[in-house]
Amino acid sequence: MESQQLHQNPRSLHGSAYASVTSKEVPSNQDPLAVSASNLPEFDRDSTKVNSQQETTPGTSAVPENHHHVSPQPASVPPPQNGQYQQHGMMTPNKAMASNWAHYQQPSMMTCSHYQTSPAYYQPDPHYPLPQYIPPLSTSSPDPIDSQNQHSEVPQAETKVRNNVLPPHTLTSEENFSTWVKFYIRFLKNSNLGDIIPNDQGEIKRQMTYEEHAYIYNTFQAFAPFHLLPTWVKQILEINYADILTVLCKSVSKMQTNNQELKDWIALANLEYDGSTSADTFEITVSTIIQRLKENNINVSDRLACQLILKGLSGDFKYLRNQYRTKTNMKLSQLFAEIQLIYDENKIMNLNKPSQYKQHSEYKNVSRTSPNTTNTKVTTRNYQRTNSSKPRAAKAHNIATSSKFSRVNNDHINESTVSSQYLSDDNELSLRPATERI
């Protein structure tokens, strides 16, 4: 009875029969891949049933004698070799064109082994979260600190730690492409591919290999969906779908233009003028900056330009701020004309200052040479000093002679006084003291 039921419903009881047989016949040290059907998850058993229903039921002669030991896992799908994701071969350009980039709509993990240089593409499983890191194409690290410690570490562990590179974010809109391409170029540089990226002049150091080209091709399409690319990028890829370097070269050129725009805005916001340079030079500088911004589709109004110029005026030009403070209709040409007028007036005044100073100095020299009392005395004193200058010995002789002569005269005067006094005594005359006589 049971044999008839088994013969009528072999598929419904295949799992239980397989479990009963394998539980008895499989030894304890069995291969971990040969798992019983009872231990498989439900979705695996469902997939096994679907595959068995699609295949044609073989005849009794084609069925092996011990058919319960056939592995339920399909032999065409190998087990995952690198973590959670199944390994696929690199998509060729023909397949990529035929699929219209449908294979690269989500970020992917592109890993390379320590001894393998060609990239491999991994399609993420929808049941697992997206990867957060992408190992670079080359395993060599430019960091000298890591190269010093490479002998003390295990090569496999070193590859896992050092070869993780943060991937760029996925492009979300056409307007964000200029920002996204900066992160993508940084990602390629961190992947040791900086020498094949065009520099600011559009030059590259070396030609890339096929593996490197495929790596750039795959990563670019993985993180930049085709429908979100700008029009100029689509035009390049329509001519040559794999010409990613041309896209990068033009992106670098556009980044330089954007940098120049930023520099022009900074220069315009930090304008300063005090008259040290000519007004014509200042006008040419400001007009060149405004014209360059206009060529990049950035229009600077006269009012904004006047406000930025007035903010940087100093010296004699500073009073123009008050003059333009109440004006609503500012004209850049009028402001330049007034700056030129003030500059010309200051220039004329500076030219007249040296002549006035020269006349004043000449007047001072004439007044010094004109005769006056002080200068006459000085001249006379100098003249006497020059004529009466005698040797020191002669001066001493003259002084001694004059003192001797004065001494002789004094003695003569004293003798006459004494004789007159004797005469007075002889006549018995009373004389008053000399003080009273006076």
Curated annotation (Swiss-Prot):
Superkingdom of the source species: Eukaryota
Keywords: Cytoplasm, Transposable element
Location(s) in or outside the cell: Cytoplasm
Residue ranges, annotated region (RNA-binding): 295-397
Recorded GO MF terms: RNA binding
Additional notes on this entry: Retrotransposons are mobile genetic entities that are able to replicate via an RNA intermediate and a reverse transcription step. In contrast to retroviruses, retrotransposons are non-infectious, lack an envelope and remain intracellular. Ty2 retrotransposons belong to the copia elements (pseudoviridae).
Domain free text: The C-terminal RNA-binding region of CA is sufficient for all its nucleocapsid-like chaperone activities.
Subunit structure: Homotrimer.
Protein name from the UniProt record: Transposon Ty2-C Gag polyprotein
Annotated source species: Saccharomyces cerevisiae (strain ATCC 204508 / S288c)
